Design a protein with these regions (language model features):
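Active-site-lining helix/loop region of Rossmann-like oxidoreductase modules
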Residues: 1-72
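C-terminal helical cap and adjacent loop that interface with cofactors, partners, or active-site loops
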Residues: 61-136
């Protein structure tokens, strides 16, 4: 919101269980039919009383066992409008690790103190020697 020049005046968050209708087994856990297999997290950011940011973030084990095909979907309403789908989704752990590793030189180069992503360069893949990106 800050990068868009918006001031969020209210934030709402919802968390609802995802109950499975089939048995689900993964390397990380088991949920039998009727049990909770995950959580559907949603959140809205309001600007001038209108929901300008709407996030839907379900997390569950083995969703495909119930016929749910996951992906990352981004919709920007504007001029021009943007609608993007990434299927299959980028594994959250891998995506997070990639972001953290590629930001290491930028964090080292940052001024001391608490920083946000707005204070650092735009994230990108660094394919070379990280030492070449660290200021002396």
């Amino acid at each position: 919101a800050e990068a868009l020049g918006w001031k969020v005046d209210k934030f709402e968050q919802q968390m609802k269980p995802i109950v499975t209708s089939v048995d689900r087994k993964s390397p990380y856990g088991f949920a039998k039919a009727g049990d909770v297999a995950g959580v559907n997290m949603t959140g809205q950011g309001y600007v001038d009383g209108a929901a300008k940011i709407d996030m839907i973030h379900p997390q569950q084990i083995e969703p495909e066992l119930e016929g749910t095909h996951t992906g990352d979907y981004i919709v920007l309403k504007g001029s021009p409008a943007v609608s993007m789908a990434i299927n299959p989704e980028v594994d959250g752990g891998i995506g997070t690790i990639a972001m953290i590793v590629n930001m290491i030189p930028h964090v080292i180069n940052a001024r001391p103190g608490l920083r946000t992503m707005l204070d650092l360069p735009v994230p990108r893949a660094i394919m070379g020697d990280f030492r070449d990106y660290i200021e002396k």
